Swiss-Prot record:
UniProt cross-references to PANTHER family, sorted A to Z: CYTOCHROME C (PTHR11961)
Subcellular location(s) per record: Mitochondrion intermembrane space
Post-translational modification note: Binds 1 heme c group covalently per subunit.
Protein name listed in UniProt: Cytochrome c type-2
Family: Belongs to the cytochrome c family.
Keyword Transport (UniProt): yes
Major location category of this protein: mitochondrion
Record-level GO cellular component terms: mitochondrial intermembrane space
Keyword match Heme: yes
Source organism of this protein record: Ascaris suum
Cross-referenced InterPro entries: Cyt_c-like_dom, Cyt_c-like_dom_sf, Cyt_c_1A/1B
UniProt keyword list: Electron transport, Heme, Iron, Metal-binding, Mitochondrion, Respiratory chain, Transport
One Pfam family linked to the record: Cytochrom_C
Amino acid sequence: MTEIPEGDYESGKQIFKTRCLMCHVVDSDKAKSGPSLNGIFGSSAGTVKGYDYSNANKNANIVWTKETMFDYLANPKKYMPGSKMIFAGLKKVEDRADLISYIEVESSK
C-alpha cells in the first residue's frame, strides 16, 4: 500500500488553483472541461454524472481513495492509459499529499 505523508491544506489549495482549477471544481457538481471532484473519495472512476469520460476511465475499475489518487497524480497518463486527463502530473510527493489534503476537505463539504 502506498504511504502518503501528511499534506498541507493551504499548499494544496495553491496547487489546486494553479494546476487544477482551469478544468475541475471541488465545491459543486458542475463539470468544467474536466469532471467535478466533489465527493470524489469513495466513488468509482468514470461515474460523475454529466461528464463524458473516455472508455479508459469508465472501464478502469478504480475506486478513488487517497492512495489511488496519490498514485494517479504522479502520472495520470501512465496510471490510466487512454484517459482524457491532459495534466502531466505532480512529481513531488509533498505536492501530491498537499493537493489530496485540499481535495479531501473541499470535496466533502
